[in-house]
């Protein structure tokens, strides 16, 4: 068993490979195998020919690493230096359409639910971090949120009693380290580049492309689209619930995300 792996991390490790990758499932590889080998050689690359964006490694309290880390050997020491952990062996591959702020919120929500509540830093700190992340994804982020997230993360890491609390901030810290520009877009520009955060998405109809087929108006569950047959239609942004039904159903590609 010790004949494979690295000097500091011998043997093999089982990982659960999932996400936006062609081949998913349980795999067992020698410690020190690179993420590139796992994602592309074993996983078959990214689905639908899209670009790789990140991989979340180590379970819910693991870290999100980028293309720059693809040749990093997956062993205990290397991942710790990169701000991640091997943890439970989860490997969630994400493509270019993934919002990293939303991902951080998703994992922080899981961590909040898993906290036993015994120590205040984990119980209250993670809840506060989740509140901030939720507010940011809903378009209500404000200056100082990034700094507060980092401050809370440091406090939780240093003060929590168990391993869950000490690693709980990893999803936020790693996405801040590698994708801070996305946080700033959400907070200051009120924009989600992937369109994942619906509260930050505004749908508009291009009058030069719209044929007035009325399909969007008929399918809109909120009755937010009006217009006459064979004439450009219009979306009432106050009524729009941002479900995306109009965009996905438009046969002419006339509906855009502003």
Where on the chain are the PLM-derived regions?
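Redox cofactor-anchoring modules in respiratory/redox and cofactor-processing assemblies
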Residues: 1-202
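Short cysteine clusters
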Residues: 32, 116-122, 162, 192, ...
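Extended, hydrophobic alpha-helical segments in both membrane/secreted and soluble proteins
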Residues: 35-38, 51, 115, 128-129, ...
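Glycine-centered helix-boundary capping/hinge motifs
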Residues: 43-44, 139, 214, 223, ...
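Ferredoxin-like iron-sulfur electron-transfer modules
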Residues: 107-110, 191-212, 223-242, 253-258
């Amino acid at each position: 068993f010790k004949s494979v792996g690295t000097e500091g991390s011998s043997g093999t490790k089982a990982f659960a490979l999932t996400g936006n990758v062609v081949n998913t499932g349980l795999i067992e590889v020698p410690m020190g195998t690179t993420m590139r080998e796992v994602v592309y050689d074993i996983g078959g690359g990214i689905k639908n020919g899209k670009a790789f964006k990140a991989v979340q490694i180590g379970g819910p309290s693991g870290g999100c690493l980028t293309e720059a880390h693809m040749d990093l050997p997956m062993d205990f020491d290397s991942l710790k230096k990169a701000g991640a952990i091997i943890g439970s062996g989860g490997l969630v591959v994400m493509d270019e359409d993934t919002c990293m702020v939303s991902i951080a919120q998703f994992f922080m929500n899981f961590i909040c639910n898993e906290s036993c509540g015994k120590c205040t830093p984990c119980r209250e700190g993670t809840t506060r971090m989740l509140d901030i992340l939720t507010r940011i994804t809903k378009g209500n982020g404000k200056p100082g949120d990034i700094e507060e997230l980092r401050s809370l993360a440091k406090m939780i890491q240093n003060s929590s009693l168990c391993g869950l609390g000490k690693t709980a901030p990893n999803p936020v810290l790693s996405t801040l380290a590698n994708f801070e520009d996305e946080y700033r877009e959400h907070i200051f520009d009120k924009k989600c580049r992937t369109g994942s955060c619906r509260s930050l998405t505004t749908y508009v109809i291009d009058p030069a492309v719209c044929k007035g087929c009325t399909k969007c108006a008929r399918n809109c569950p909120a009755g937010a689209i009006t217009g006459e047959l064979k004439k450009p239609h219009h979306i009432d942004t106050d009524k729009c619930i941002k479900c995306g039904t109009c965009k996905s159903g438009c046969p002419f590609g006339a509906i855009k995300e502003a």
